[in-house]
Amino acid sequence: MSLKVLPSRNRFDRLTAGQDRILLTLLLLSSLILAGLLRLAASRSKDSNQLLTEADRLAWLSNWQRAGELYARAEELAIQKGDKRDQLYAACGRLRSSIGLESVPQTSAELTQILQDPIAASDSRLRIRCLATKGDIEREDHPDSAYRAWQEVLNLAQGLDDKSWQARARAELAIIEFMDGKTAKASDLLASALTSALARADLPSLVVYGSQVGNGLVEMGRAGEALDYCNAALHIAAMVKDIGFPYPAYVCKARALAFLGRPDEGRELLVQTLNQTRQLHAPLEESQVLIALGQVAAAAGDRRAATQYFEEAGRLSRANGFIHSIAWSMYEAAKVYRDVGLYADAERCETQAMNAMRQVADEYHLPLHLAVLADLKAKEGDLTKAQELYDQAADATESLLANSPNEQIESSLIATMSDIYKGDFAVAARLGHTAEAFRIVETARGRSIADLLRRPRLQEGELSDAQKAAKADFNLLQRTLMKTSDRTERRELLDKLFLAEQLMGVRTQPANAMQDATLRAQPVDLAKLRTVLLPDEVVLEYVLADPTSFCLVIDRKREVIIALPAGGTEISETTARYLGQIEAAKHADQDARKLYDLLLGPVWQLPQTTRLTIIPDATLWSLPIETLRGPDGKYVLQSHTVSYAPSSTVLYYLRTLRPPVEPQMAFLGIGAVPYDLEPKDTSTDRGIMRAVSRGIYDISGAHLYRLPASRQEVIGAEQSLNHPNRSVLLLDANATESKFKSEPLANFKILHFAVHGVASPQFPDRAALILGRDPKSNDDGLLQLREITQLSLSADLVTLSACDTATGKLEGEEGIYGLAEAFLLAGAKSVVGALWNVDDSATEALMKDFYTHLAHGQDKASALRQAKLDYLQRLGDRPPVFWAPFTLVGDGSAPIIF
């Protein structure tokens, strides 16, 4: 359990696919590395025992087996010489090497006695060694005492100006802060530790910190990023002589592989690691490897093996007093027993887990444990007790969210805790508490957007000098990356790009926790929501879960929860199959009808309405509802206007909040970017788009083919609106990032981008619109998500006529985090984006019709619907891949008043 650490605010949680090489390049800096490894030895007095010097070196390398042997020998020699100081120092090192082998109370008592010795009170180096041992030993059972020990280590190291021990203390404090639910402080501490280790080329510490962050990322459901960290740690460990066996890195990698659908690879790693722990007599590490083996077995569907591993880990942990490991192993066992219907065994294990939790301050995992107990009570039919436990879990989750340092960590926390919201919703639905069920799900949905709609945004002028310098370096690296296709050069640039990303730190930060709490948006009241709905409008808010999924139906008069005829797994599998057929340019009528029956068929209000506002869940974020076919064989598009929103709360704010000043300019369009290659032929359009979306940030790179239809698309849109004196077109050499940013963006009602787009679900901040680059500017030509959120807009509409611009990283019940959401954060009322790779010529025709209908006074959602109908009327029943990629997210209910 102690391996789990939250990623840092400065985005050390986002690495390139080649991140392992970032740190390996440090091996070339031999002088720095040598200095880092010898710093501890040089800091000791000249008459220090040679054994202690070597033991300290091995200890810093986490090679505690060999270090312990040397500390024991040094202790004997010091006793023979009568050197009390070295005797105490060696004893502290020996005690640290015995973690898991000796009684914790006995070891703690011996350490307390040493620390009370006058020699230890006056010798900072000796005291650091003993306090570090105390902190390591007591972290499992007495985190408060461990925290005080590491805080004193930090203070002493600052007095000695010892950067190595300062960084190590901050990393250990981060672990304890995270377990206590203080995610913002934990993020800051770990960021500082990792930055320091990178600057000093402290390779052993990078192995430790990289493993910690990687395991934390697995906890947050970000396995792809976690794998990069752990690969880096393992590569470094393999290159550093005498380093201890990196158990946490192997555990991290195996868990990440299991999450990524590769459990067999993970199991192979863990079996080797388990043998190593037993050979080295490391019971704490053995218990954690057993837990990881259980997780991998569960991911592979072998639930019997999973429970055996968890139970074995629990027995080993109880025998050795590993409190966190008891809680972790029994929690995992309880989940598996619950899923196979063995509720008595599940409750037995979770009761043991909760008893262990009460002995330590692990606020981060508390909501998850409470949710398991709540789910068990619900399955037993005790809905009142289940609701009480879910309420406790929700309160504990809110405490964590109140401490989150930025909107991405907030989103990741919500994603991790999604089962809490879904389970609580299901219980409220079964109890008939519709308003309460709505409040529960709306607490999570679109949370970061709802919060930031009311929170002041950090503006460019408020960046520190260091942040501005880091941003300039970042842009230079991206410009260079865009120019080269050499794999070796790109690999090096991607590594450097990651390091520059970590120094950017441009995310919005609240002034203080108290102020931030007052700015957090509460879920909208149902009565208030109904006041902003149109007479013919119904909101469909979906909750996908097993065994039952739900649709919360809201119109101006009432709200009702409808149980859908399938669970989340069946709906998600059908959706994935349907989308695969769509992207293959097929009609997929059978699945289109099945999804209609599952998602819309039970909604009895449907025939009485003409406008649907969809609040999606899970895979439904990728599904264009308008392509489904009803009982009459017609598309939903033919009977209903469809738009989408992150949540009902966000929808309410978008319809009620007004910009400080109404925009005076009608249209800003950017297109005809002079990319480097001419297209080969029109049949390759979608393949070209797919290659671009995939290739900007990989080793091979991607060529940017010009989009010949984009010029006429932008010109046609502007002409359709017929406001030439209130429009600005940025075409050809003027279609640059710097030109775009130089415009008074807050003064435009419509922003239109006809450009290439880059989707990056693994690294969402890298998602970008690819504009031109002015050689006189420092901009890189990539308008990235992180930059978009810092814009100040008042636009009624942003149109992203580029591939995959309505996609992003799915953050559980929070929703999608991508380009469309970034523009909503920046102040746009609505965003039109694409769910897949779009056809250049088809897009031109659709957009021309869209703007024509806008100019005629139709509301935004209706104008987009009519443009799609026009396309079908002209070309017949073409597959949805051509006409359905564009969806409207946000408020599409009103026309744009020019």
PLM regions and their residue ranges:
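An often Trp-containing, charged/polar helix-loop segment at the C-terminal end
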Residues: 657, 661, 666, 842-898
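Catalytic cores of nucleophile-dependent amide-cleaving enzymes
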Residues: 749-849
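Residue signature of alpha-solenoid helical repeat architecture, marking inter-repeat boundaries
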Residues: 45-46, 85-87, 125, 164, ...
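Residue register of alpha-helical TPR repeats
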Residues: 49-50, 89, 129, 168, ...
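Amphipathic alpha-helical segments of tetratricopeptide repeats
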Residues: 72-76, 112-119, 152-162, 191-202, ...
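A domain-level signal for caspase-like cysteine endopeptidase catalytic cores
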Residues: 492, 618-620, 657-758, 800, ...
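Amphipathic alpha-helical protein-protein interaction segments
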Residues: 383-639, 652-686, 694-698, 719, ...
